[in-house]
């Protein structure tokens, strides 16, 4: 890794070690701050802003800061401490957020450095990015965890703040380039779980040869308290029972040739 890459800086929200639900094997997940979407059900609203934010810690008292400026070299050193676990389990590094590729200079440098160190890489993305960003990082990404939050463009705009045309265009581009893709689909009761949405989602997945699994992520109210701390309005609804996700998986599995599994929002 050259000196310029090593010194590239980004705003890191958190680093999770020993993760098992964000790609294969045991993984280290680096969460970057900043996102172009404003999903009303977001469980990480503290990831929206690109700047560190300090709030009152209503659980432990005092203050809590979301986000810290770090260099690629610093984060890579932390990631590589877990390399024996990656090697033993087929794991690696996952970038998440927020939208990790919105900090493209930092994300690109970290992904390239991880690949140079022999680490498997995955990126969770909303896909609402300039094509040039996708093109820049694609050679250093082994697996894409691609968020599909709804198939209807107008409803997508209502629920996330943006249309889904660019998201779908970038997804098709990645598929054309031979990318390995898992579709990650939050399911929010009465908002995006209609028969029509599931049918269109199944058709999309079946049309993309690189998609090998669809993960269903049922609604969680995890972001409500964090949103209140930050003065942000986050959609609040009851936690759906376990059979809700099971029902979505059954309905979608009947419509698609791809594997459908339960993920976690």
Each model region followed by its residue ranges:
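Short glycine-enriched, charge-decorated loop/helix-capping segments at active-site entrances
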Residues: 48, 64, 157-163, 230-238
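A general alpha-helical scaffold signature found inside nucleotide-binding enzyme cores
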Residues: 70, 162-169, 243, 247
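Auxiliary Fe-S-binding modules of radical SAM enzymes
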Residues: 1-24, 189-265
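Conserved AdoMet/S-adenosylmethionine-binding subsite of the radical SAM
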Residues: 76, 80-229
